[in-house]
Amino acid sequence: MKQFTSLSRVPQAALAALILGAVLLPSSSSPAQADQPLPSINLPIEGWTVVALKKGFLQEEYNKLGTKVNLVDPGTTQLIGAESALLDRGGLAIAQRMIYPATVHKANGIDASIVWLSTKSSEYRTPVLALKSSGLNSIADLKDKNFGSSRVACGWTSPTEIFTAAGLPLDNARERGQVRYTNISNTVATSAALLSGRIDATSTHVALPDVAALIETDEVKVIGRSPADGVYVNNAGRVAYFVMREFVDAHPQAIVAFLRAREKTDAWINANVDEAAAIIAKETRIPVAIARFGITDPSSFQYMQGEPSSQVAVDAIKTFQKWYIDHGDDILSSRHLSDDTIESFVDKRFFKGGEYSVYQD
């Protein structure tokens, strides 16, 4: 069966409306029998998925199910959080975010399950950045300055811990802190705000193409990092793949196919970095040097090992949820997940020892 890539880009206003609808409307999912026919599946365009399609790893797995693969732009670079709307409306079968925003989506009413989690994050992934020419050299220099990032993302979770550790808390919905905070839900707009001086510093994934370009051109510098033993690195900064519960119950083998293809592709990319970077550059329209940076830099997040233990996943959510609530998280304070909900949020069938696990016992 022929495979093809479909690139779908949605206007920002439409994405915002979709997200609002995804949050406000209750889920109508109901139990379904496993392994229902699946003629096609929409997967997110990522560095590894474009390589997997080009090299045939996705086709190898999905041809066994008679399923055609479409790669779809999840819209996250246009509007952070867009993937939740696409997931809820059926435009995307599997979404990828860090575990904190995935948990916020769950708290906002998305009936989704985590089917894969990465091992712990890194202090290099989401540092605090300032312009090289700014004169700002440490977190202490940001007192009463303007910090901007995406609220429901690592651009908030990582710096919240960094600033708290430095005794300079960010503004939050409850009280004024010692650093002004602006929510900017677009990675390109965040970079533009930093370059134009509208904000003094930001925090985001260094491996994202627009941010990697600022690093490679020596326009920004790191002035603070997440504690290596902290809540972000060990818990909130883990990568998660999550799926609507109705879909995963109906098509568990489609999830297994995705996870198997990911493992094969990740191994191939690590062994063939230059060829992989060339494929990613061509398919996602970024410079080869930036594609290579996204693979090899310590901040990389798309090519991590999986966390086999479902208990570690459950404990990670419980740990970071409590920590952020204790430190002014207005979202999870009002809509936090119960222990029972967290237990069911992590679909143990896809972790080690589970019925659909890709991990060897």
Walk through the language-model features, giving the residues of each.
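Pocket-lining segment of extracytoplasmic ligand-binding domains
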Residues: 100, 178, 182, 186-283
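Sec/Tat signal peptide C-region and signal peptidase I cleavage site
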Residues: 28-33
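Conserved C-terminal helix/tail region of periplasmic/extracytoplasmic solute-binding proteins
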Residues: 321-361
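Bacterial N-terminal signal peptides that target proteins for export
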Residues: 2-15
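Short, glycine-/small- and polar/acidic-enriched structural segments
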Residues: 35-184, 200, 206, 224
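Short, solvent-exposed loop/beta-turn-alpha elements that line the ligand-binding surface or hinge
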Residues: 59-69, 227-234, 301-314
